[in-house]
C-alpha cells in the first residue's frame, strides 16, 4: 500500500504583517489574488498525476492569512483537490484564520467545502500585548470568532498562543491561557517568541527593547505544560497540546517524516525521496507556473542514513519520542 500523503497550500496574503513574522507573507498585494488563484489551480492540476497512487489524509491551508484570501477561493481549491487527488473521507482538512477575517457566513462556506479543523491565531488575550506586535484583532474578536466557528458547525478548533511577548508577565500569560481555555478549543499551540532576523521586532530589539529572557520564558513554558495537562490537554509535542483524539495529524506528519506536497511561494515538499521548496516570491511563482518556468528554489535527495537520523531527531520533539 502506498504511503499516505499530506497536502499543504500556502496563502501569502495578509491584511497587515505582524512584527515578529518571518513567514513568506505580504500585505497590500490583494490585486494579485485572482492571478495567484489561477496559478495555484494550475499547479495543483499539473502535480496530480504524480500523486495519483497516494491516498491523501491531511490537507493544510496556511499563510499568511487564508481566511483573508476568501472562503470562496479556498472552496474552489479544495474542490479541485478532491476531484483530482484521492482524498480520504475522514481526511483532516485545516484552514488557518485570524479572528478579524472570519464570520459565520464565511465559515459555513468552508465547513460545507469539507474543512473540519480551524487553526486560529489568538496569540494573546491582552490588548496591549497584541498592539505591541501589531496584531490587528482584539480579544473580543477572538471570542466572536470562536462563537462563529461553533455556529458554523466546527467541532475541532485550535488556538495559537505566544509566550515571551514584549511586556508580557507571568500574570498576563496566565490570563491569556485561561481565556483560551474558556473558549473550549480542542487543541492549543503555545509557541515561545523567536526574534527572527530581518523582522521589525528584531530591529526593535536591536534598538534596546527588552523581552522576557530565557529563564522567564522557561518559567512560562513549564507553567503552561502543567496547567494544560490539568485542564485535559496533554502535551504531545514541544509546543502542542490537545484533548484526546485531537492532535494535529498534519503537523505530526512533519515530525514523523511522512510525505507531503506543498503549493505556493515558499512552500516545502518531501515527496518521492526528494525534498524541495519553491521560490519565496509571489510574482516569480505566478509567472513560473503560468508560463512554464522554473519555480524550484532548493532541491535535494536525502540519503537513507540521513533520513534515519532526521527521523530520530524529529521524533524527539514528540512526547512519545
Predicted feature locations:
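Conserved N-terminal Rossmann-fold NAD(P)-binding element of oxidoreductases
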Residues: 9
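C-terminal scaffold of the Radical SAM
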Residues: 2-5, 25-49, 54-321
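Local cysteine-cluster metal-coordination motifs and their immediate loop/turn environment
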Residues: 12-25
Amino acid at each position: 500500500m502506498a504511503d499516505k500523503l499530506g497536502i499543504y497550500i500556502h496563502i501569502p496574503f495578509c491584511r497587515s504583517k505582524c512584527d515578529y513574522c518571518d513567514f513568506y507573507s505580504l500585505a497590500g498585494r490583494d490585486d494579485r489574488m485572482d492571478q495567484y488563484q489561477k496559478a495555484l489551480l494550475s499547479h495543483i492540476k499539473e502535480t496530480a498525476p504524480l500523486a495519483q497512487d497516494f491516498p491523501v489524509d491531511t490537507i493544510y491551508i496556511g499563510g499568511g492569512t487564508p481566511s483573508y484570501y476568501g472562503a470562496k477561493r479556498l472552496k474552489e481549491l479544495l474542490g479541485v483537490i478532491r476531484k483530482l487527488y484521492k482524498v480520504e473521507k475522514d481526511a483532516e482538512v485545516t484552514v488557518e484564520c485570524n479572528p478579524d477575517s472570519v464570520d459565520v457566513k464565511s465559515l459555513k462556506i468552508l465547513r460545507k467545502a469539507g474543512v473540519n479543523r480551524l487553526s486560529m491565531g489568538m496569540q494573546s488575550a491582552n490588548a496591549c500585548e497584541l498592539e505591541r506586535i501589531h496584531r490587528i484583532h482584539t480579544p473580543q474578536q477572538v471570542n466572536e470568532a470562536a462563537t462563529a466557528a461553533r455556529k458554523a458547525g466546527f467541532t475541532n478548533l485550535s488556538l495559537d498562543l505566544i509566550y515571551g511577548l514584549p511586556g508580557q508577565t507571568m500574570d498576563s500569560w496566565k490570563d491569556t491561557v485561561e481565556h483560551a481555555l474558556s473558549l473550549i478549543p480542542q487543541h492549543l499551540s503555545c509557541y515561545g517568541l523567536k526574534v527572527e532576523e530581518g523582522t521589525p521586532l528584531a530591529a526593535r530589539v536591536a534598538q534596546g527593547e527588552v523581552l522576557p529572557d530565557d529563564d522567564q520564558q522557561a518559567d512560562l513554558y513549564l507553567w503552561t505544560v502543567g496547567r494544560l495537562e490539568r485542564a485535559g490537554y496533554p502535551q504531545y509535542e514541544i509546543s502542542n497540546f490537545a484533548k484526546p483524539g485531537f492532535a494535529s495529524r498534519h503537523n505530526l506528519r512533519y515530525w514523523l517524516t511522512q510525505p507531503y506536497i506543498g503549493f505556493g511561494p515558499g512552500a516545502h515538499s518531501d515527496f518521492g525521496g526528494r525534498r524541495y521548496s519553491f521560490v519565496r516570491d509571489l510574482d516569480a511563482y505566478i509567472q513560473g507556473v503560468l508560463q512554464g518556468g522554473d519555480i524550484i528554489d532548493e532541491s535535494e535527495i536525502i540519503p537513507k542514513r540521513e533520513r534515519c537520523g532526521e527521523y530520530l531527531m524529529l521524533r524527539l520533539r514528540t512526547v512519545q519520542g
